[in-house]
């Protein structure tokens, strides 16, 4: 058994892990409970308005969705590094009877999204969530007796430090759509004839801002004389700042259509000629 080698843990070690009598040298940390709340909150608001008269009709919708993160944030960075998500939306449609023959439909839509997450080791919450399940409960204490971050040679990125003291990453999205549809009825000249002109502009942008940093950790032990010994691992790096435009998309679209629709007795005829760009 054990190839004749001495046991890695003694009976005294197991007792200390179990009764938490020496939490700094024999930690037993439930990382899920230490880092994450059991629940979170989501907010959603929407306001709609409609109205008009025989000349114009409108519809407007304004909405907001907000989600708070599951990470605990007992203090750390001045900027809240918890996972959050905010979305603002607005859409409007207006139908206008310019003349008896000419009508216009205008559509405007906009959306702004922003998500924040802790920096972790540079890749955000993915680093933290994967580390929660791969870090043993006895790997290191959350903090040492002197308040420094706990760690070891094998685990040189403290999980709580990654959550509240690693800076933050912000992902942003901006979407705008504008469209107009004009229709002229030539029925007074040629029954059933009309012309449509459609134009739209779409703009989408995705960006990421990273303001991340790392902290050193210390492996705490007690030497044979009873003195505290702190061995440093990892590297303390000041906050870096970077901005990247992940994607930018713009599209302009135009269409011209000539429509003809007539009813001849029991027969209905409909034809369209389209051109777009």
Model-flagged regions — what are they?
Residues 229-240, 252:
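Alpha-solenoid helical-repeat scaffolds
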Residues 1-21, 120:
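Conserved small-residue
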Residues 194-202, 270-276:
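Extended hydrophobic secondary-structure segments that form protein cores and membrane-embedded regions
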Residues 23-63, 67-70, 81-157, 167-174, ...:
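Flexible loop and strand-edge segments within Gram-negative outer membrane beta-barrel domains
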Residues 76-81, 121-133, 211-221, 227, ...:
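Flexible, surface-exposed loop regions and adjacent strand-edge segments
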């Amino acid at each position: 058994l054990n190839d004749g080698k001495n046991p890695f843990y003694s009976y005294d070690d197991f007792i200390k892990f179990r009764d938490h009598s020496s939490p700094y040298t024999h930690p037993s940390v439930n990382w899920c409970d230490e880092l994450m709340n059991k629940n979170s909150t989501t907010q959603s608001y929407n306001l709609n308005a409609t109205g008009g008269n025989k000349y114009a009709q409108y519809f407007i919708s304004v909405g907001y969705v907000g989600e708070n993160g599951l990470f605990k944030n007992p203090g750390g960075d001045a900027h809240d590094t918890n996972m959050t998500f905010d979305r603002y939306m607005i859409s409007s449609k207006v139908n206008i009877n310019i003349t008896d023959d000419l009508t216009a439909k205008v559509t405007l839509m906009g959306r702004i999204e922003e998500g924040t997450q802790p920096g972790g080791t540079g890749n955000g919450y993915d680093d933290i969530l994967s580390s929660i399940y791969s870090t043993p409960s006895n790997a290191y204490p959350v903090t040492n007796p002197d308040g420094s971050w706990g760690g070891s040679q094998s685990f040189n990125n403290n999980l709580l430090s990654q959550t509240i003291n690693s800076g933050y990453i912000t992902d942003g999205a901006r979407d705008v759509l504008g469209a107009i549809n004009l229709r002229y009825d030539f029925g007074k000249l040629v029954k059933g004839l009309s012309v449509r002109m459609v134009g739209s502009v779409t703009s989408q942008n995705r960006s990421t801002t990273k303001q991340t940093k790392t902290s050193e950790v210390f492996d705490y032990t007690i030497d044979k004389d009873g003195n505290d010994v702190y061995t440093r691992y990892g590297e303390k790096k000041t906050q870096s700042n970077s901005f990247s435009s992940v994607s930018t998309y713009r599209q302009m679209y135009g269409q011209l259509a000539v429509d003809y629709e007539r009813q001849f007795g029991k027969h209905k005829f409909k034809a369209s000629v389209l051109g777009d760009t």
